[in-house]
A protein has these predicted regions:
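C-terminal beta-sandwich interaction modules and adjacent acidic
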Residues: 1-284
Length: 284
């Protein structure tokens, strides 16, 4: 049996230029190594790792259940130290830069979807456990500018309709892209084809998350437009509205086992009967 080799007394510390980054930006770090032992190092590497937490169905032959698991969506590794030998009192300082890929997924901490990034500095030590220094970082989403319409008009291309025997519904938005911390404005239109009584007319901002076999639906904001109204054949009504997008709203996302989807819904709530609604998918 091979003798037990104790972990060498080597300390790693890092100094990051920032704790949050955008895709395509460099992650610059100063790496400090201090040794109190004589130690051989096979290699020193810097890793940028994006970890996804999701659920999957597992079965023991009798029962099936959801099991939480995790996996790497991204792992970028670069070497900063070639094979070397450390001695007591050895101190090393290395500046290293790694570029985040342009398509890097953002950090997301939702009800279901969870994506996290970390910087992992590793020393590969023969015949014993590697030495790590890990730092959490935040990768921010790249937001898209919201087009501004002249004279308060809504773009015709940002219109979606739905029809049935009762009537026609239409949602018109000022943009199909939302920005966290801002409002999304639009107009909800109803044209009735027959007598229709509803308990309420409202619009909702809805977020749908999915991580493997687990999902969540959240109404993030809601505006009540009308209560207890009856539409007669040929009647037309329209309402302006604004929905608030929270500062902490996660961006639209689809990669690996995870997704975040956003939509605006215009709803005729008929309570005892199936609601009549129209949905407009948006990107955040």
């Amino acid at each position: 049996m091979a003798p037990f080799l104790k972990k060498p007394k080597v300390i790693i510390s890092t100094d990051l230029n920032s704790e949050s980054f955008y895709p395509g930006e460099p992650v610059n770090t100063r790496i400090f190594i201090s040794s109190q032992d004589k130690t051989k190092v096979r290699a020193g590497t810097v890793n940028l790792i994006c970890t996804e937490v999701y659920w999957k169905l597992v079965s023991d032959g009798k029962h099936t259940r959801n099991q939480k698991t995790k996996g790497d969506l991204y792992r970028i590794e670069e070497e900063f130290l070639t094979p070397t030998e450390l001695f007591p009192g050895t101190e090393i300082s290395v500046q290293k830069s790694i570029i985040l890929p342009a398509d890097s997924p953002p950090t997301i901490s939702g009800r279901v979807v969870n994506l996290s990034w970390q910087l992992d500095v590793k020393l590969d030590i023969p015949k014993t456990r590697d030495i790590h220094e890990k730092r959490a970082i935040i990768v921010r989403p790249i937001t898209m500018a919201t087009p501004v319409m002249d004279d308060g008009e809504f773009a015709r291309s940002n219109r979606i309709t739905k029809s049935n025997d009762e009537g026609d519904l239409a949602l018109i938005l000022d943009s199909d892209h939302g920005i966290a911390g801002k409002t999304l404005s639009g107009r909800f239109e109803v044209m009735a084809k027959q007598d229709t009584s509803v308990d309420s007319v409202r619009v909702e901002l809805e977020m749908n998350e999915s991580a493997g076999t687990k999902s969540s639906k959240t109404v993030v904001d809601m505006v009540q437009l009308e209560n207890e109204i009856t539409f007669f054949p040929g009647a037309q009504r329209q309402w302006l509205f604004s929905l608030n997008i929270p500062d902490s709203a996660p961006p639209s996302f689809f990669m690996g086992n995870s997704s975040v989807e956003w939509r605006v819904k215009g709803i005729l709530d008929k309570r005892r009967w199936k609601d009549f609604s129209v949905e407009y998918p948006i990107r955040l």
